[in-house]
């Protein structure tokens, strides 16, 4: 699913060239994807919200057509946040509506804390508040669900596993986890495989995880976030339990949560109409 009205462009920020897709005019809505995705995970949202905003769906550093630094140290939260800050300013905006899923959501949480003046509204899809995730990792149930993160700490083996049998693990991640198996066409799966197969991409993508336990998300205390926030959560997420959302209101002053039953981690791809409706309602569109 590629719209001819989508424009592909690049911007250099924080010493790195980032690729993004954009459509629309007006205030900035910035979309941050997760693992193992790229800008394409927002294919059902870009045109819908381009009716109201300048939508920018970026490839995070290391992904798809964005630059892929080789050093593991390049994949830490401080660098991700500098990328986003520079992207917003480079697009000549002072602030944005920030939308993030999975890893993109983790970056969005941290960015909203670090730069609340640059985030008008925060919209988070299937990633818990960092404090809640840290709490969750102390429980046996979530530790088991997150066991893949420990596998990803190993050198080279995760890359070999991901590449084997024509990226079968990647296909299984989407189609196997999805409640609605029709949410991903074979063309969608091929798009994700092609992005992961780009030179240096797999190691870059995995390096996000290889730094995670030394990074800021798990090694700080979190205050009250003043940015108005919407969380949307697919309840059948096999990697992140719904219980990780409980108590988020202790960390976010103005919070709404919308749960979607019978929906997996890939919430905006599996239930795009409902996700779009919840975002539109939240923004008063």
Give the positions of each predicted feature:
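Flexible "cap/lid" subdomain of the alpha/beta-hydrolase fold that forms the substrate-access gate
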Residues: 1-9, 16-18, 56, 63-99, ...
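Short phosphate-engaging motifs
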Residues: 28, 38, 169, 201, ...
């Amino acid at each position: 699913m590629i719209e001819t009205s989508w424009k592909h462009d690049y911007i250099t920020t924080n010493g790195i060239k980032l690729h993004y897709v954009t459509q629309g005019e007006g205030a900035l809505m910035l979309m941050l994807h997760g693992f193992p995705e790229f800008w394409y995970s927002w294919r059902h949202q870009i045109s819908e919200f381009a009716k109201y905003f300048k939508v920018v769906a970026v490839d995070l550093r290391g992904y798809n057509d964005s630059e892929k630094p080789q050093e593991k140290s390049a994949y830490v939260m401080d660098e991700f946040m500098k990328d986003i800050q520079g992207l917003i300013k480079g697009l000549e905006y002072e602030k944005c509506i920030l939308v993030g899923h999975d890893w993109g959501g983790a970056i969005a949480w941290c960015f909203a804390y670090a730069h609340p003046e640059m985030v008008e509204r925060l919209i988070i899809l299937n990633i818990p508040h960092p404090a809640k995730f840290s709490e969750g990792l102390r429980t046996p149930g979530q530790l088991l669900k997150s066991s893949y993160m420990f596998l990803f700490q190993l050198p080279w083996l995760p890359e070999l596993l991901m590449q084997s049998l024509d990226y079968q693990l990647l296909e299984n991640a989407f189609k196997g986890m999805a409640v609605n198996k029709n949410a991903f066409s074979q063309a969608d799966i091929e798009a994700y495989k092609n992005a992961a197969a780009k030179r240096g991409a797999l190691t870059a993508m995995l390096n996000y995880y290889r730094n995670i336990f030394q990074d800021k998300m798990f090694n700080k205390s979190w205050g009250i976030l003043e940015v108005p926030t919407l969380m949307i959560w697919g309840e059948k997420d096999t990697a992140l339990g719904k219980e990780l959302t409980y108590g988020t209101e202790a960390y976010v002053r103005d919070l709404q949560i919308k749960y979607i039953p019978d929906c997996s981690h890939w919430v905006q791809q599996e239930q795009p109409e409902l996700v779009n409706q919840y975002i539109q309602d939240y923004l008063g569109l």
